[in-house]
């Protein structure tokens, strides 16, 4: 699987689009807001800036993209005025892979600029927004051009499927699964862990060259509390998706060999794995590292014991996951819209049944870093 070509959130603003099904990601941004605010406040207090470089990495599309930028600008503006300083110009860079729906973002900019002027008094001559296409697992910006880097719900995606998972032996390494599970052999766990180490180190090293000394970075992504990568909090949503896919295999709608050869380019690390890679690179000080529980549906459904509640929460989770992974499934399995609809209908039922018994939650890790001088 060529991750850079096939990984993108569902485009547009239709019923299965990311724009309409990103409540969980919005909740994650909201939970991390105090940490973002603290970091932005420190930058504004410690630097008299005429121009401020801000990058949102893995920006995707939809309402979350510009809302987080608006909030960061609010924070800078509030602190600057409190200190009696002029508000700096904003150089905003929105980054994602080449296949991201940048057009959706660009079409939203006129209304965004209008709101900036009406609500905040910030004219177009004070805010410059650009799209930057490419992988953040490598350099994206000139040296020392950024003051603040934000990334949310992106760094759990790997740059590639871990090498070696496509076994040449007769028996597949991770048979019947699409990600790490309780039945996965140690070699699968090791391959995923090593890929994360390589990717995250590359990310940190690249940003260390692009941020000014004293620059800040707040990263938020899926993780886990346990050192065991097979716990429910880190991989059970993939396990349930595999169950839905295998039900289609049993009916002859999907080839089993296709399932055995699919491995999600995803990894939910524990805090210790993150610390090790940051210390290895040596360019940043860890200011904060915290974990938060997030409901699979973003907390929208409170009563899952009733038949209606079970149905509703299953559908909400299925829509959220579909908006994120459909492009990969479509590319790998080559299935049409009818089978895709059937798959996520089954997934919704499986998820609803699971959450009516156990309210498994995501663990979202938020880390605030300071670039060393």
UniProtKB/Swiss-Prot annotation:
The entry's jasmonate-binding residues are 25, 156-157
Q: Which cofactor does it need?
A: Mg(2+)
Where Mg(2+) binds, per the record, is at: 174, 260, 262-263
Q: Name one GO biological process term.
A: methylation
Q: Which residues bind S-adenosyl-L-homocysteine?
A: 18, 59, 64, 96-97, 135-136
Report the Gene3D superfamilies cross-referenced here: Methyltransferase, alpha-helical capping domain (1.10.1200.270), Vaccinia Virus protein VP39 (3.40.50.150)
Origin: domain of life:
Eukaryota
Tell me its EC number(s), please.
2.1.1.141
Is Ligase among the key words of this record? no
Q: Where in the cell is it found?
A: Cytoplasm; Nucleus
Q: How many cofactor units bind, and how?
A: Binds 1 Mg(2+) ion per subunit.
Catalytic activities: jasmonate + S-adenosyl-L-methionine = methyl (-)-jasmonate + S-adenosyl-L-homocysteine
User: What does the entry list under GO cellular component?
Assistant: cytoplasm; nucleus
Q: Hey, where's the site called Involved in substrate discrimination on this chain?
A: 150, 222
Could you tell me which pathway this protein works in?
Lipid metabolism; oxylipin biosynthesis
Q: Do you know which Pfam families this protein is assigned to?
A: Methyltransf_7
For this UniProt entry, the molecular function terms from Gene Ontology, in alphabetical order, are: metal ion binding; methyl jasmonate methylesterase activity; S-adenosylmethionine-dependent methyltransferase activity
User: What UniProt keywords apply to this chain's record, in alphabetical order?
Assistant: Cytoplasm, Magnesium, Metal-binding, Methyltransferase, Nucleus, Transferase
What InterPro entries does the database record attribute to this sequence?
A: MeTrfase_7, MeTrfase_capping, SAM-dependent_MTases_sf
**Family affiliation:** Belongs to the methyltransferase superfamily. Type-7 methyltransferase family.
Q: According to its UniProt entry, what is the function of this protein?
A: Catalyzes the methylation of jasmonate into methyljasmonate, a plant volatile that acts as an important cellular regulator mediating diverse developmental processes and defense responses.
Question: In its UniProt entry, what is this protein called?
Answer: Probable jasmonic acid carboxyl methyltransferase 2
Origin organism is: Theobroma cacao
Q: What is the lineage of its organism?
A: Eukaryota, Viridiplantae, Streptophyta, Embryophyta, Tracheophyta
